């Protein structure tokens, strides 16, 4: 068993990310036993290591209950009132179940929800098989906070029919407006209302097929992760549980890189399709794949029998395709223009350029300004010496100084945070030395994070741009530089 705790700036305070890797050989393969052990581990970590431990009582239990129900069916699309009545028997017992590693409540909700989802999947297609009558006046309540759960399946069907009718109507209005405009321009023939209504229904059917396909690939553990997060977020909004798969995505997002072929995938009509070729990646460099190509099978060597992936969960198919830099993967591809062929790809480190700092020059009649946009405070947690926000900001500042700028603008708009260490380092580029931020840990211990380097990289005019989506690390950097009268 391997356990890691991550302290990470994401939204104004230091957040606790709990990540567990549990070896399949360390205990019984029974899923229920695994869930119980995981609940026990999470509870222990929160109790011993969280900055602000909570009292696990009936009030806590009620909040977890409300949070979990809202997380799984906030729009009242699946569950019935009778289900909620059954669930409510546990509303003030979840605290006891947490303390005893009991998952009876979760099991009940999980089984009931999946049953209801199957029922909806079986009847929504009937609703969309026939045209809607838009001449009939109907009302629908879209305020999900005040909307009640359906009394029974018939009422749920009515609710779905109205929502689908509204969705088709929205699509109809949009498609009709587009068609009329294209007709005026002479690029398209004018379509009948019946044709446009059919197109709108077909679009909704395709969207719902994708939704239920995605849902069918969710495993019990995915739902249990939602339950765990309903518990841990009661400690504070910035405490999260990350399953191994989510942790991998988290690392990719915060580092801005991953090892693989350099393509994004989606699942459509039971097939794995290339949705984007990432600039700079192996596929892009050698022009090996195109958007719309379908991956039929994957092999790790020329001699290996390819594994069909059409019926796989998308994340499982992705795991087969990704791999360490320098290794090869062999994909059986159905080309978007037709034809099937095998493509050999050498995996490499793929950098997501949209993650990284970028600079540009702004000029007016009298001055030249440097603008640096920083989307997030990225870092490789396994190796700070690798590319990170601070090292890239330093390079951009040096580059802009060579262009003899008169002032510098650091754009942190929409930057939701990231690595605290990079914040301290970046602050140091603009001040001689001194404290940047104070971190208070469990037990009341206070740590002052300082810039100890007396050198200043940029001592000229400095402007920091922030907006309502600038959070956490962005707020710390902006506040520190303001306190030092540097911005």
Regions found by a protein language model. Give the residues of each.
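Extracytoplasmic/secreted proteins, especially bacterial periplasmic and envelope-associated proteins
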Residues: 37, 41, 59, 63, ...
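Acidic/histidine-rich, surface-exposed loop or edge segments in extracytoplasmic proteins
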Residues: 39-51, 89-93, 206-210, 375-378
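Well-structured core secondary-structure elements of compact alpha/beta domains
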Residues: 146-156, 160-206, 271, 298, ...
